[in-house]
Regions:
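Extracellular glycan-modifying ectodomains
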Residues: 68
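Cleavable N-terminal signal peptides of Sec/SRP-targeted secreted and luminal proteins
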Residues: 5-21
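Divalent metal-dependent phosphoesterase catalytic cores across multiple superfamilies
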Residues: 24-39, 43-46, 54-56, 63, ...
Length: 390
């Protein structure tokens, strides 16, 4: 019996490792061998982005135009978007002193081929892209690469682009609290507890306002299990804040704003959002619940696309946004955004679901890593705990 258990455990571990290997292929950024990149700067090549300041109207996402030119264009040329804009070897963590660090040790947060919207690029050497950026707590730069994704060469580097306030509180996501009349709101910012005090201003719609303090958490590179999250996929996650809105009246509408009080006395505010409180337990009411899994994420500008693998995720979020008035709560039961060790993709995901998660509770099922194996083999496991883990 003991031998049989050992064999079964071995099979589970092998299948789990196999799943992890396959899932890594789901992430388009994993196709880029950024650690092999070399510099081949060409004075006759250029890349520039405009405008250089984004979010002038307070929005957390914005579009820009990237224009580029290469005297030696090829079908393997591509544009990488880097954030922070400083992506040189000076940002590489010290590892083996006997080995020279790579010239580039951070993967781009998104990429697109140079001929994507300029089909004549190979013959003219000129092209342009319309790209959408989200506020991710740092500035951006754009790089023109040649020689494909596996042996990339840097041909030109652009000017820097930034949002008006890169540290602003963004992407709120609601979750049902531990009791029926409690709601939690979690968001991301660039403000640590040594810079500002996070809080939520909230109250009944049209009524008096109150303030609830928020806790602050973050994590470092050392908290990651291994590559690519500890290496090319690492990106500073900023600070994650959570506030608790308690003693809500059943079925009442509430509005809220995210705030940070800087130690110089000034305040930083988010946009205003709203939600409807839960009904009283046992109340005779119709609750419309959305349950789905394996959604993934995608880019509205078409970047980071690999075999049209995750375009459907945009259709899902758009449909949910369209039907939002008829939705009371969302359960996303695992396989969230397929970041697979590329930390920047979590910001992209929370930005994609913000219109939903800021309005209705967006609950995440917390699975053990072996859930895929359990599904494949029909193994009976304890059900997942529903929790907000974004």
């Amino acid at each position: 019996m003991r031998e049989l258990r050992s064999i079964c455990l071995g099979i589970l571990l092998v299948l789990g490792a196999f799943r992890l290997t396959i899932s890594h292929e789901d992430q388009p950024l994993s196709k880029i061998a950024i650690h092999k990149a070399v510099f081949a700067l060409d004075d006759n090549a250029y890349i520039k982005a405009s405008p250089s300041i984004l979010g002038m109207k307070g929005q957390n996402s914005d579009w820009l135009t990237v224009e580029y030119n290469s005297p030696n264009p090829s079908v393997g040329d591509w544009i990488g978007v880097f954030s922070p804009s400083n992506f040189s070897s000076s940002t590489c963590p010290a590892e083996n002193p006997r080995v020279y660090p790579p010239l580039l040790c951070s993967a781009p947060i998104k990429f697109q081929y140079a001929n994507y919207s300029s089909p004549q690029y190979k013959s003219t050497g000129k092209g342009s892209l319309k790209l959408q950026l989200i506020n991710q707590r740092s500035d951006f730069s754009f790089v023109l690469f040649t020689n494909g994704l596996l042996n990339p060469k840097v041909v030109a580097v652009s000017n820097k682009v930034t949002f008006t306030n890169p540290n602003a509180p963004v992407y709120p996501r609601l979750a049902q609290g531990k009791v029926w009349n409690e709601m939690t709101v979690t968001w991301t910012s660039g403000y640590g507890i040594n810079e500002a005090e996070p809080f939520v201003e909230w109250g009944p719609k049209g009524g008096d306002r109150t303030y609830s303090p928020a806790g602050t958490l973050t994590f470092g590179r050392g908290s990651m299990c291994g590559a690519p999250a500890r290496t090319v996929g690492w990106r500073d996650p900023g600070y994650i804040h959570t506030g608790f809105l308690r003693e809500l009246w059943p079925n009442a509408m509430y509005t809220y704003k995210l705030g940070h009080r800087l130690f110089n006395g000034t305040y930083i505010w988010s946009s205003e959002y709203q939600f409807k409180a839960s009904p009283y337990p046992g109340q005779d009411s119709l609750q419309q619940v959305i349950i789905f899994g394996d959604m993934g994420k995608d880019e509205a500008d078409g970047s980071n696309e690999y075999n049209n693998f995750q375009r459907g995720s945009l259709n899902t979020t758009r449909q949910l946004i369209q039907d939002l008035k008829n939705i009371d709560i969302v359960f996303h039961i695992g396989d969230i955004c397929y970041a697979n060790g590329y930390i920047s993709q979590w910001d992209q995901f929370t930005a994609q679901i913000e219109p939903i998660a800021s309005t209705v509770p967006y609950m995440i099922a917390r699975f053990v890593i072996i859930h895929y194996v359990a599904h494949q083999l029909g193994t009976a496991l304890t059900g997942p705990k529903l929790d907000l883990t974004l």
